[in-house]
């Protein structure tokens, strides 16, 4: 990487998805990405952070291996902004009571679905047989099993994840769009076996722009990189969107920069481009 000590990126915010973007498909961090982030933050003064569907406990280990403690992170696909330096949720947008009723209707219509409800500091599991236990078990995440959605009602819900086979998830998507009050929440696809629900006007993009406002960063200096449909809103929201090489066509169609495959260091590609171009 060329040395450009005369450049100052302290008025820039660059945000990256984690799985399939910052990390490889094997969920390892390419040394090239780490080196590029260290250079962008420590040498050039830029703001870099992560935006993920993960909760705080799951994202923490990925956050702390990077030199980015001064910049809060986006958690729960935009439902929260967490300041790891203060260890404090500085913004949390909870799903409304109408949204909870929508989740109830979905589970009544598709009783075979597994449901994960993410609160600020816990994961609530309903009908957890395969997907839920695997998810919380992989990172040993704090969680609680609930016998029904009603048992989870007293909590503030950041996001709801419906788990099921791909053909069932497709039916869930179609059903939710037909419901009255569907405009009171925001839906997104995060994989072929998951469909997520958040509060209205809540996604990675809204939280990234809110974070930029907190940091006093102008729109023209906001950038983000992602690889899948749950990154779509974030990429549409920032000035400079980038797609990893393996991203679907729909993601590449809205990107201004096209990085290499995540296995080869897509984040480094993007940061090098920013340093060279701006």
Residue ranges and their predicted role:
Residues 44-49, 69-71, 159, 220-221, ...:
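Short active-site oxyanion
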Residues 25-29:
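Conserved ATPase-coupling elements of RecA-like P-loop NTPase cores
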Residues 18, 54, 226-228:
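Active-site metal-binding loops of divalent metal-dependent hydrolases
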Residues 112-225, 232-237, 246:
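Conserved acidic, metal-coordinating active-site core of Asp-based
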Residues 68-69, 77, 181-183, 237-238, ...:
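Short, structured coil segments at secondary-structure junctions
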Residues 31-132:
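Active-site phosphate-binding/coordination module
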Residues 4-13, 30, 196-278:
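Mg2+-dependent phosphoryl-transfer enzymes with acidic/Ser/Thr/Gly-rich catalytic loops
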Residues 1-16, 35, 39:
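Non-catalytic pre-domain segments flanking phosphatase-related domains
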């Amino acid at each position: 990487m060329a040395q450009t000590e005369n450049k100052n990126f302290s008025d820039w915010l660059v945000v990256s998805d984690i799985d399939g973007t910052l990390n490889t498909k094997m969920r390892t961090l390419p040394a090239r990405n780490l080196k590029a982030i260290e250079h962008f933050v420590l040498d050039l003064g830029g703001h870099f952070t992560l935006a993920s569907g993960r909760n705080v406990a799951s994202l923490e280990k990925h956050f702390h291996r990077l030199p980015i403690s001064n910049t809060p992170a986006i958690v729960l696909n935009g439902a929260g902004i967490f300041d790891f330096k203060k260890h404090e949720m500085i913004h949390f947008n909870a799903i409304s009571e109408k949204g909870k009723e929508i989740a109830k209707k979905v589970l009544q219509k598709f009783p075979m679905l597994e449901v994960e409800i993410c609160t600020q500091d816990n994961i609530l599991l309903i009908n957890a047989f395969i997907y839920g236990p695997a998810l919380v078990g992989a990172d040993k995440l704090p969680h609680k099993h609930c016998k029904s959605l009603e048992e989870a009602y007293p909590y503030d819900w950041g996001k709801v994840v419906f788990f099921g086979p791909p053909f069932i998830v497709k039916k869930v998507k179609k059903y939710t769009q037909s419901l009255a009050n569907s405009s009171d929440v925001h839906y997104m696809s995060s994989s072929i076996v998951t469909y997520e629900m958040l509060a209205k006007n809540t996604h990675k993009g809204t939280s990234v722009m809110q974070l930029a406002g907190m940091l006093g960063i102008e729109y023209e200096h906001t950038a983000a990189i992602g690889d899948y449909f749950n990154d779509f809103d974030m990429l549409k929201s920032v000035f400079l969107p980038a797609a990893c090489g393996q991203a679907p066509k729909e993601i590449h169609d809205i990107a201004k920069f096209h990085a290499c495959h995540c296995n080869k260091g897509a984040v480094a590609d993007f940061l090098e481009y920013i340093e060279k171009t701006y």
